[in-house]
């Protein structure tokens, strides 16, 4: 069985149902709030674990109850979370998601501990890169950290897969040279190409 290492973000999504999106200065009453494990990195790890893969999640969380929500969710599908870094001075990443009656949403992301993951953290845990077969990355952690992780993974002969979200204003050409598979959605593909994408063949 292939070993998958996910290096990336862990967020807890606070999903709030609202009758309509508030405008500046407006106070509205929400229906309810639900705490949902999320973060693009954790979502990748959860999906791979649910499919039966051998998965390790590497990232940074806070020393709080939100990190417990993430760990419990990932553990439920067999993902190894023993290498997560705990930042006592930061909260676990959070996302405030308002959803109106038509299903439209607005999202505010608080990076929290995700923003603290560094190249030095990756270097200190290179045994995880050496031991995996596939590296999965996204861009909700510092870009320099992603580039370093992808570069080292390629040097170790690993397959590197990138979910290029959120797409940075200037996508570093260097990162392309370390990627084997890139999986943007339609909007992200258009941002990367600098032009609309209207069909799969394009």
Residue positions per predicted region:
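Active-site-proximal loop->helix
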Residues: 65-77, 95-103, 125
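Conserved phosphate/ATP/ADP-binding segment of small-molecule kinases
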Residues: 150, 154-202
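Structural detector of well-ordered beta-strand residues that form the stable sheet scaffold
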Residues: 5, 56, 136, 161-163, ...
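Cofactor-binding loop segments of dinucleotide-utilizing enzymes, especially the Rossmann-like FAD-
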Residues: 9, 59-63, 86, 99-101, ...
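Conserved phosphate-binding/catalytic loop of the ribokinase/pfkB sugar-kinase fold
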Residues: 82-87, 97-134, 139
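Glycine-rich phosphate/adenosyl-contacting loop at the front of the ribokinase-like
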Residues: 1-60, 65-79
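Residues that scaffold the ATP/ADP-binding catalytic core of kinase and kinase-like folds
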Residues: 15, 108, 191-195
